[in-house]
């Protein structure tokens, strides 16, 4: 990579395992980025374990950290990456910081994973307070350049339901009009052309031509479903999409193929290791299902393409 590319990543931190900043920093560093991490929480482990302990950063503490960077004139970034946030005032402070950074650097790219909820058995539910939704809709998404919602989050943000691929792209057009040039719906319950064993993801990238007109590239990807429930995959996805869109800014197809293929390598390695540790016929524990990130370094750096994207 030519020159230094620096990312401010505001996400959660765990002592053990890989979620939030722990899932984002390693792949970004492997791919050549400098990463400055603000830990929105510091927990012993993710909350899928039986027990966890830790601390939560307040909006005032976030402001103090940023003011420290500013006082030393080192608040200069090429990218901002944000993920799970539970607190409205904290999210508001993130908005203020990103606005200021964008005023300093008009080329700064803000990558936002608008973590709000998901669908289980066809029913969607939010796992953050509902008062975060208007903040995402009115302030966060209009500032973002790249967003990575799942289907339920895309529906929440747009106020529209998705029952087909056509409706999904109509929702993505609504999201484009709100602000972001790149929208990737990371998972959906839409039927895949490859059958019920596959999960469908969709991407849309709006590009401006020199004459001022816009052209939109749309893609579809099908990934084989995996059995265990992993934690941190969304954080890993957003970080790698940041990296690969930086390296392929006008080719969402290639950026998504590299991102999703690297994800598949990490997940398959994690499944193999977890099953071996758990033993024959035993269900792996949350600790055994932690993403095998370090062991997947070469796959993250140069992924063999195992998932092809279809340009639509």
From Swiss-Prot:
Its EC number is 2.7.1.35. Keywords: Acetylation, ATP-binding, Cytoplasm, Kinase, Magnesium, Metal-binding, Nucleotide-binding, Phosphoprotein, Sodium, Transferase, Zinc. Activity is increased in the presence of K(+)or Na(+). It comes from the Eukaryota. Mg(2+) binds at residue 118. The modification N-acetylmethionine is found at residue 1. GO terms for cellular component: cytosol. Its cofactor is Zn(2+); Mg(2+). The active site is at residue 235. Pyridoxal binds at residues 12, 47. It catalyses: pyridoxal + ATP = pyridoxal 5'-phosphate + ADP + H(+); pyridoxamine + ATP = pyridoxamine 5'-phosphate + ADP + H(+); pyridoxine + ATP = pyridoxine 5'-phosphate + ADP + H(+). Pathway: Cofactor metabolism; pyridoxal 5'-phosphate salvage; pyridoxal 5'-phosphate from pyridoxal: step 1/1; Cofactor metabolism; pyridoxal 5'-phosphate salvage; pyridoxine 5'-phosphate from pyridoxine: step 1/1; Cofactor metabolism; pyridoxal 5'-phosphate salvage; pyridoxamine 5'-phosphate from pyridoxamine: step 1/1. The modification Phosphoserine is found at residues 59, 164, 213, 285. It is found in: Cytoplasm, Cytosol. Homodimer. This is Pyridoxal kinase. It comes from Rattus norvegicus. The gene is Pdxk.
